[in-house]
Amino acid sequence: MAVESGVISTLIPQDPPEQELILVKVEDNFSWDEKFKQNGSTQSCQELFRQQFRKFCYQETPGPREALSRLQELCYQWLMPELHTKEQILELLVLEQFLSILPEELQIWVQQHNPESGEEAVTLLEDLEREFDDPGQQVPASPQGPAVPWKDLTCLRASQESTDIHLQPLKTQLKSWKPCLSPKSDCENSETATKEGISEEKSQGLPQEPSFRGISEHESNLVWKQGSATGEKLRSPSQGGSFSQVIFTNKSLGKRDLYDEAERCLILTTDSIMCQKVPPEERPYRCDVCGHSFKQHSSLTQHQRIHTGEKPYKCNQCGKAFSLRSYLIIHQRIHSGEKAYECSECGKAFNQSSALIRHRKIHTGEKACKCNECGKAFSQSSYLIIHQRIHTGEKPYECNECGKTFSQSSKLIRHQRIHTGERPYECNECGKAFRQSSELITHQRIHSGEKPYECSECGKAFSLSSNLIRHQRIHSGEEPYQCNECGKTFKRSSALVQHQRIHSGDEAYICNECGKAFRHRSVLMRHQRVHTIK
């Protein structure tokens, strides 16, 4: 049988103690490449690569070298070292581990907000804590099911003891979280299981003393399949070679049974095994797209919206729809004007915690995202991606009307207003409308008299930065505009254009009365006085 990526390596118990355990491979028809192509989101694709890397198991490859090469490829696709610095890669790993120790409901909620760092994830949780300070507050569930009271949520770790145990208040819970994967305790359990067979709690229905053949006592001893016959010997690290993840199962189990049991124990590395015992009865709801499983149907429903694009929560003000109720709450702050997140440095307020986190980088000067081509640094990876299109020439956003392409979606949106005639930015003073918000801001200075751009030499102020730049050339003597014909230079581009008409003979200003043409508009205006006098 062929092996496809996406199956979690697991140790599966046997009911009859006398039956021996054999090493098998699992077939899963899930194609990661197809799912990658179907999903246009870079962040979603990166998450798929992360899952594929973490769940990779030994396939029908010629040997360990090819398996290692495949793991390296998946790791590269996930961490993207060509874009991320060492610090960012470390941040991704820490963020992944932090999310893994969260209770399931919180884990889903945080993941759907796509935090870029551990700090951002913590801020999201702290914001959620404030929202649920009210004891009667409820956690949003799926539209098909009722909202779940916050204190009735079940912790991932606590669920192994009793699914009826209620959560502590969030503030207490945040202080008492423990990793679901404990290297010390779990590896000790793994070592004991290797020495004595698999010895698990009777409550989980595991056999007391099944036997393994040829397995080392060390918890880090993973094995490769040798041949395909029943009763094959298992090789230990002391026999040489490289090692991968393995699946032990009773030969009577079918492929579907094995797939359903595939989350008993996850073996993460060969040097430090960390087993996460998640009985399938506690996670019965599985996503058909990416293989994630959940304890509650409502959690699966929320997760599936990532793949389906369903957005059941609609804003009554503007009609915009969202996949999560929490997104709708954040969006509604645009209409209400609420800005709950304030910068302690400058007092500027924001309606999203993530926006505040990005803003703080202005004060700290943090620019961790560096361009490999020119060395320019940015505070956000999204800015770096946009910047790199300067070097690659990529313009992925195309206008359906004229075919013109742009490197940024915002530029395409502004361009399309030329075709639609849309002018969404209107002046409250005179009613004049503009295509861009920057044009409205500039226009409003006519009414307010604001002149924010001041010359450091003479103190003269201007309403536009371009006017200040032109003015400063008086002090510096700079004349950057040069005529290609005679070499004469000018302070303003308009002066150069007028001068070039001498060489070209172009007379752009024509009198409507007599048809006489002039090079300069001022000369035409003087000429027109002749007709008005008559």
Swiss-Prot record:
InterPro entries per record: SCAN_dom (IPR003309), SCAN_sf (IPR038269), Znf_C2H2-type (IPR050758), Znf_C2H2_sf (IPR036236), Znf_C2H2_type (IPR013087)
Gene3D superfamilies recorded: Classic Zinc Finger (3.30.160.60), DNA breaking-rejoining enzymes (1.10.4020.10)
Keywords: Cytoplasm, DNA-binding, Isopeptide bond, Metal-binding, Nucleus, Phosphoprotein, Repeat, Repressor, Transcription, Transcription regulation, Ubl conjugation, Zinc, Zinc-finger
Keyword Membrane on entry: no
Record GO biological process: negative regulation of DNA-templated transcription; regulation of transcription by RNA polymerase II
Zinc finger (C2H2-type): 285-307, 313-335, 341-363, 369-391, 397-419, 425-447, 453-475, 481-503, 509-531
Family annotation (CDD domains): SCAN
PROSITE patterns xref list: SCAN_BOX (PS50804), ZINC_FINGER_C2H2_1 (PS00028), ZINC_FINGER_C2H2_2 (PS50157)
Name of the protein described by the UniProt record: Zinc finger protein 397
